[in-house]
Amino acid sequence: MTKEERRLWYDFLRDYPIKFSRQKVLGKYIVDFYSAKAKIIIELDGSQHYDKEGIAKDSERTAYLEEYGLKVLRIPNNQVNQNFRGVCEYIENEVKQSLCMNNPSGKNQ
């Protein structure tokens, strides 16, 4: 894991009320973090994700994962370093929204 992945895991996701797994194999990919309940994948992106080849690979990967009804959150590494609280709030909001969409009646599953 990168230092950004370690920080997000140990300082936020590891003890998050909704279970997240790290380095989870999903089909032909290994994702950084995955919540089956929220149907969310979190990918932390370093600089290699922003060149032409990286963008193309990420686009293909995201499309593949979205075919299974998963939402992919792509977060630049520098945001984890510079705005950790904002990253956590963003994830929190996306998880809440996803849980509401996956359980519109509000009943516990």
Regions found by a protein language model. Give the residues of each.
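Nucleic-acid endo/exonuclease domains
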Residues: 1-109
